[in-house]
Amino acid sequence: MIEFDNLTYLHGKPQGTGLLKANPEDFVVVEDLGFEPDGEGEHILVRILKNGCNTRFVADALAKFLKIHAHEVSFAGQKDKHAVTEQWLCARVPGKEMPDLSAFQLEGCQVLEYARHKRKLRLGALKGNAFTLVLREVSNRDDVEQRLIDICVKGVPNYFGAQRFGIGGSNLQGALRWAQTNTPVRDRNKRSFWLSAARSALFNQIVAERLKKADVNQVVDGDALQLAGRGSWFVATTEELAELQHRVNDKELMITAALPGSGEWGTQREALAFEQAAVAAETELQALLVREKVEAARRAMLLYPQQLSWNWWDDVTVEIRFWLPAGSFATSVVRELINTTGDYAHIAE
């Protein structure tokens, strides 16, 4: 298995170094649900600003304040503890009376707004996230500047970030032990983390191998292509390659890579043979995913940060702003810019 730090770069290994997250204010995340609260219903959507506390901790504190069980407070995604983050929590509070959430107090946390909503906010139910990152102590401004320009055109690999695999790769190591011993894992969180790490590592490996090709975005026979921003895909045939290539070049279509698991992977012929060869050595992880009935899926191979802009405060400090769809990792963008001295594994998704 390829270590995360050794995965293939789209723009070549960065020439310079830099510091990511010198302080929490250097990593700002604003959650974008993609919808507004209904204004009625048995749930309350609460938009919070937090610094120095993780999402679960705030959710538990909110439940205690509202005198409801912790499982009655949900969220669309975990946000980093060591960052300034803005996100929505959802509390189930039936009844006509609206609690006064302006009285909710928690160090490092502020309620920005709240309103009634008809449906529970479920994990993953967000459109994306807007990021404002500050890279400090940048050693090669010209290289970073050129990379930012190139990323606007060519994007970055849509790798799962190192944080998906746990500190020191602990989640992936857990998956490997589980695969090798076949010992039942009762802890639901561990099961989820380990299976996710296994599938993500296989995806990363497939993408890393594809990026070694001379023309990364060249459609081949049997590729599974996805309409940009959509989840479904279709298979490319030899007769359509020229037309499909044009649509990929226009970013209307995205080439996808496998999230291996049980069932068909989605590619056929040449593309399927390539993907299978890329992870052929990882038989134990593949067998684990099949055994645990994790369904195979697809994910775009490349990621195009939207609304990408940047501002150099001085020759060694740059502020970068961009928006990413749900499930994508800001650290996969930073990885193409600098050899960072920050710790990826401590950054929540």
UniProtKB/Swiss-Prot annotation:
<dbReference type="Pfam" id="PF01142">
    <property type="entry name" value="TruD"/>
</dbReference>
<comment type="similarity">
    <text>Belongs to the pseudouridine synthase TruD family.</text>
</comment>
<dbReference type="InterPro" id="IPR020103">
    <property type="entry name" value="PsdUridine_synth_cat_dom_sf"/>
</dbReference>
<feature type="binding site">
    <location>
        <position position="329"/>
    </location>
    <ligand>
        <name>substrate</name>
    </ligand>
</feature>
<comment type="function">
    <text>Responsible for synthesis of pseudouridine from uracil-13 in transfer RNAs.</text>
</comment>
<feature type="active site" description="Nucleophile">
    <location>
        <position position="80"/>
    </location>
</feature>
<dbReference type="InterPro" id="IPR042214">
    <property type="entry name" value="TruD_catalytic"/>
</dbReference>
<feature type="binding site">
    <location>
        <position position="27"/>
    </location>
    <ligand>
        <name>substrate</name>
    </ligand>
</feature>
<dbReference type="InterPro" id="IPR043165">
    <property type="entry name" value="TruD_insert_sf"/>
</dbReference>
<dbReference type="InterPro" id="IPR001656">
    <property type="entry name" value="PsdUridine_synth_TruD"/>
</dbReference>
<feature type="binding site">
    <location>
        <position position="129"/>
    </location>
    <ligand>
        <name>substrate</name>
    </ligand>
</feature>
<dbReference type="GO" id="GO:0005829">
    <property type="term" value="C:cytosol"/>
</dbReference>
<dbReference type="GO" id="GO:0003723">
    <property type="term" value="F:RNA binding"/>
</dbReference>
<dbReference type="GO" id="GO:0031119">
    <property type="term" value="P:tRNA pseudouridine synthesis"/>
</dbReference>
<dbReference type="InterPro" id="IPR011760">
    <property type="entry name" value="PsdUridine_synth_TruD_insert"/>
</dbReference>
<feature type="domain" description="TRUD">
    <location>
        <begin position="155"/>
        <end position="303"/>
    </location>
</feature>
<keyword id="KW-0819">tRNA processing</keyword>
<protein>
    <recommendedName>
        <fullName>tRNA pseudouridine synthase D</fullName>
        <ecNumber>5.4.99.27</ecNumber>
    </recommendedName>
</protein>
<dbReference type="GO" id="GO:0160150">
    <property type="term" value="F:tRNA pseudouridine(13) synthase activity"/>
</dbReference>
<dbReference type="InterPro" id="IPR020119">
    <property type="entry name" value="PsdUridine_synth_TruD_CS"/>
</dbReference>
<dbReference type="InterPro" id="IPR050170">
    <property type="entry name" value="TruD_pseudoU_synthase"/>
</dbReference>
<keyword id="KW-0413">Isomerase</keyword>
